[in-house]
C-alpha cells in the first residue's frame, strides 16, 4: 500500500490526495481515511476534501473543522499520540493519528480499523507519515493548501515572512528547535532562521523597524544576507557585518535588531552576538533561569560600526535556550499591563515541568500572549526555543514519531 501510494504521489496534486489515500489504504484494512491540516495559528484542524478553491469544500456529513483545544483530534495533535475515538459494535473503531514531518506537526488523520487488527494499526501510523511527506512536498506550490490553512486575510509583509521562514519545528536525536510568531496574518519586521551544518546549529532572530511592508522587506534582506554569509563560512561577527553592509546599501536607512547564535551539539558550546536585541535566556533543571549578558553592537543598518562582543557559555543536557523579540514581553492587556519577562519565563518553566514538548509549549505560549492582549497584538512577537539533549542525544528507540498509549 505504502509503495503504491508513494509511487502515485509523484504525479498527484493536492486535490487528488484525499481520494488516493482512501483508495490505497483500504487494501490493508484501513478505511474511511480523513485528512485534517492545522491552520497557521494552530487553533483549528481543517478537513482536506480535495474540492473547491481551498481543497476543503463539500465535506458531506463529515466535520469540516475541529478546534485543537478540547477535541479528540486536537488531543492527538497536541500530544503527538494516537487517540481512540468511537468504538463500534462490530469490532471497528476510529483512530486519530498525528501527521508529522519529522517533528513538524502538519495535522491529523482519522481512520476506521478493526480493534483486533494490529497490522492495520501499524499501517495506519505509516500511512500518516506518508501523508505528511506528500503534503510537505506538494505544499510549496499548492494555493489550495495555503488557502485552507488560513482563517483570515494576510498582509503582503506577512506573505513575505511566511515564505521565507524554515519550518516551525525541527528535531534530531540531539536537539529540538521550535518557533512561534504572531500576529500571523499581519507580521511586519519579525522573523527567525535556523540551520544545521554538521555539528553546528545556527540560530537567528530579527526584528526590523516598523510594521509595514518595508519592514518585511528589510527583515527579508537581513535573512538573505545572513544565509549568504553563513553558507560562505562566515563567523558570527562577520555575518553581522555582511548584514549591516547590505542594509546600509539597500534598505534606505532602515535597521534591524538581531540575535545570532551557534551551538555545537556535540560539546554544548554556545556562542552568540547581539545587535540591539533582547538577551537570550537559558532554562536549566526545569527552574533555574539565566539571562545571557553580552555587550551588544548597535542595530544592523545604522552604520555606527559598534562591533558586538562574541560571548560563550557551556550548555548542559536538558537546557532550553530562548531567543525572542521584544514583542513577546511587551504585549499589553487592555489595562496596559505588559505580559512581562517573568510571566514569559515562568510559562516556559511550568511547561517544562509538565513534560510538555517544545512545539506544544510554544503553541500555548503564543496563544497565552494573544489572550493577554485581547487577541490582537500591536507589535510582532517572535520566540525561538532550542532544547539540547546532550552529546549522546536521545536513544532512537525513544524517538518514535507517534506514541500509542
Predicted regions and their residues:
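Conserved beta-strand-loop-short alpha-helix elements that form
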Residues: 199-212, 272-274, 314-335, 385
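Regulatory cytosolic signal-relay segments
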Residues: 126-187
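Acidic loop->beta-strand submotif enriched in PP2C/PPM serine/threonine phosphatases
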Residues: 90, 258, 294-335, 375-378
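Active-site-proximal, acidic helix/loop segment immediately C-terminal to a metal-coordinating Asp/Glu
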Residues: 119-122, 212-232, 296, 320-373, ...
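Amphipathic alpha-helical "output/dimerization" segments
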Residues: 116-136, 221-224
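A short, aliphatic-rich beta-strand micro-motif
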Residues: 83-86, 91-102
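Catalytic core of PPM/PP2C metal-dependent serine/threonine phosphatase domains
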Residues: 19-31, 153, 157-166, 216-296, ...
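Structured interaction and signal-relay segments at domain junctions
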Residues: 18-80, 275-276, 297
